[in-house]
């Protein structure tokens, strides 16, 4: 896979590289697509720290950690995704 599009057995793709930091959760939000359905995912700060222990503990640092580990994060998101489910999905340190 080229890294631009991740598609696994769960039929969800992550073609959109948009992501944002949500200080109310605190987590990085990103989106996946299953046909015409959009699913929201959040990866919390503890999970990002587990993946990249040297990440700066601020918005920029967490976004950079997400960008540097996008393929790993999207693979974990695909594992928790349930087709036809509504709502959002949370990735935590235990997912890594």
Residue ranges and their predicted role:
Residues 2-32:
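Short, charged/polar N-terminal "headpieces" of proteins
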Residues 2-8, 54-96:
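Acidic, low-complexity intrinsically disordered segments
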Residues 12, 19, 39, 46-49, ...:
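Flexible, active-site-adjacent loop/turn segments at secondary-structure boundaries
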Residues 17, 26, 38, 71-75, ...:
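A generic signature of intrinsically disordered, low-complexity regions enriched in glycine/proline
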Residues 18-21, 37, 50, 55-58, ...:
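A broad, structure-centric signal for solvent-exposed, well-ordered loop/edge residues
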Residues 27-54:
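A short, structured beta-strand/loop element
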